[in-house]
A protein has these predicted regions:
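Alpha-helical transmembrane segments
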Residues: 48-65, 129-145
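Residues within membrane-spanning alpha-helices of integral membrane proteins
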Residues: 17, 21-24, 97, 136-140, ...
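A small-residue-rich subset of transmembrane alpha-helices
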Residues: 87-117, 191-225, 231-237
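Alpha-helical transmembrane segments of helical membrane proteins, especially in multi-pass transport
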Residues: 146-154, 176-204
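Transmembrane alpha-helix/helix-exit interface in multi-pass inner-membrane proteins
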Residues: 105-120, 132-161
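Histidine-/acidic- and/or cysteine-rich, low-complexity loops and terminal segments associated
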Residues: 1-59, 81-85, 122-128, 150-171, ...
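Residue-level signature of transmembrane alpha-helical entry/exit and packing/kink sites
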Residues: 16-20, 49-53, 92, 96, ...
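Juxtamembrane transmembrane-helix termini in multi-pass membrane transport proteins
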Residues: 6, 54-101
C-alpha cells in the first residue's frame, strides 16, 4: 500500500478516497454475487451461522457506509497530515476506519442475536405467515417514526459536519484516533441503524433494497436538503409498513431464523 506520509496531501486524499471506493465496489460485487447464488430477497434465515452472518454483515456495511463516511475519513486524515507538518505525532487514518467498522460489526452481532431470539420465539409460538408479515410491517413503521425523532436529527447533524466533529471530539494518539472512529461510528449507527434493521423483513440479501438505503443515507448526509429527503423517506416507510400490516404478504420476504429453519 502507498505510504500516507510520502505523498502530497492532495494525492493522499485521492489515494484514500480511491481505496475506500474500491473496497466498497468490491463489497458490492460480492453482495451481488451472493444474492444471485442464494436468492436476492432472502431474509436472515439463510442457514447462516453467526460467523458467516457477521462476514456478510461487515461486507454489507463496507459497501453501504464507506462511500457516505468518506468525507469524515478524509477530514480526519487532513488534520493528521497538518499535525505532522507542525512536527506533532501522526496517526494512520486506518486506525479511525477500523474503529468505525468495529462499531458496525458489534451492531451486527447484536442484530444477529436479537433476530435469532425473536425468530425462536416466533417459531415456538407457531405464528402464521400473515402474522410475521404484519410484524415486518411494524418494523418498517418504527423505522419511519425514528427518522422523525430528535435523536435521529442530532446523529445526522454530527455525520453531516465532519469539521464540527473534529473540533468537538478530537483526541491525540492512536487510542484517541480509535476512540474518535468509534464515536463517529456510534453517531452513524444512531443515524442509520433502523434503516438496516428493515433489511431483516425486506431481505438481508435484497440488493435493490440495499441500493435504495445506501442512496438515502448518502442523500441525507451529503445533500443540502438531505434532512427533507429523510423525512419524505420516513413517510414512505410508515406507509409501506401500514400496507404490510393491513395486507399481509406485501413484503418481499418474511423474517426467518438466522440460524436456519
Amino acid at each position: 500500500m502507498v505510504s500516507e506520509i510520502s505523498l502530497p496531501l492532495k494525492r493522499q486524499r485521492y489515494v484514500i478516497l480511491g481505496l475506500l471506493l474500491a473496497v466498497a465496489a468490491a463489497a458490492w460485487g460480492i453482495l451481488i454475487w451472493q444474492s444471485v447464488v442464494d436468492g436476492q430477497s432472502m431474509g436472515p434465515g439463510m442457514n447462516m451461522q453467526a460467523l458467516l452472518f457477521l462476514i456478510i454483515w461487515v461486507d454489507m456495511m463496507v459497501a453501504m457506509m464507506f462511500p457516505t463516511a468518506a468525507p469524515m475519513i478524509l477530514t480526519f486524515h487532513r488534520v493528521q497530515v497538518e499535525k505532522r507538518q507542525r512536527g506533532q505525532s501522526f496517526v494512520s487514518t486506518w486506525v479511525f476506519v477500523a474503529a468505525y467498522l468495529l462499531i458496525w460489526t458489534l451492531f451486527g452481532a447484536v442484530a444477529f442475536a436479537a433476530a435469532s431470539g425473536i425468530q425462536l420465539v416466533m417459531k415456538l409460538s407457531m405464528l402464521s405467515m400473515e402474522t410475521t408479515s404484519r410484524l415486518g410491517g411494524l418494523v418498517l413503521i418504527c423505522a419511519g417514526i425514528y427518522q422523525l425523532t430528535p435523536l435521529k436529527t442530532v446523529c445526522l447533524t454530527k455525520c453531516q459536519t465532519p469539521m464540527s466533529f473534529i473540533l468537538t471530539s478530537w483526541r491525540d494518539g492512536v487510542r484517541g484516533a480509535f476512540w474518535m472512529g468509534a464515536k463517529h461510528g456510534a453517531y452513524c449507527l444512531g443515524c442509520c441503524w433502523l434503516l438496516f434493521v428493515i433489511l431483516f423483513p425486506i431481505g438481508i440479501m435484497n440488493v435493490a433494497a440495499m441500493a435504495v438505503i445506501t442512496a438515502l443515507i448518502f442523500a441525507e448526509k451529503s445533500l443540502p436538503f438531505g434532512r427533507r429527503i429523510g423525512q419524505i423517506a420516513a413517510l414512505g416507510l410508515i406507509a409501506y409498513g401500514l400496507l404490510a400490516v393491513l395486507v399481509p404478504g406485501m413484503l418481499p420476504t418474511n423474517m426467518q431464523s438466522p440460524s436456519g429453519m
